[in-house]
Amino acid sequence: GNLKNRITKGSWHVENIVKVDEKARVVYFLACGMDKNENPYYDHLYRVNLDGSGLKQLTKKDFFHEVTMTDDARFFVDNYSRVNTIPTAELIDAATGSKVMTLQTSDFSQLFAAGYKFPEIFKVKAADGITDLWGTMYKPFDFDSTKVYPIIDYVYPGPQVEATNYPFTRMTPRTDRLAQA
């Protein structure tokens, strides 16, 4: 077919089309990298009219979002977190981005009672002095700033998957284990 019109443009990445509401002439999509002050890997849900007008971010800033939309595109469940926050699930109105209700906030009380501490997110400049590099630092739970610790640079340089977790997931603790060793 022929291109009718461009719907989005900009120096950011569309990750996934979540839903096309043909009746309302709206597309919902996950994208990252729009906010230059935020980790560029945090996915956010947006809506935009099929003619390219009315672009609106529907999810909270500065979190990684995983969303599931209802079949009628009226609501979505937003599971959001970072590696240094407690995961939360909310029901959101898809037209406005307004919270309808909190569905669940994870209970970390036993983790914290056992000494768990969140990792630290950081941003540094690359050697070019321009490019921002984002990372996560895991420290021993009994970290002592007067001691010297080895650094483990946990990198996966392949194109298939990132080695860094952005939301708090079941995989997050595996990196914590290295810091505790």
Residue ranges and their predicted role:
Residues 36-41, 82-85:
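Short, solvent-exposed loop/turn segments at conserved positions within beta-propeller repeat blades
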Residues 1-23, 32-37, 48-65, 94-118, ...:
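Multi-bladed beta-propeller domains
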Residues 30-33, 140:
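Short regulatory "switch" loops immediately downstream of catalytic or recognition motifs
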Residues 24, 64-181:
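Serine-hydrolase catalytic core recognition
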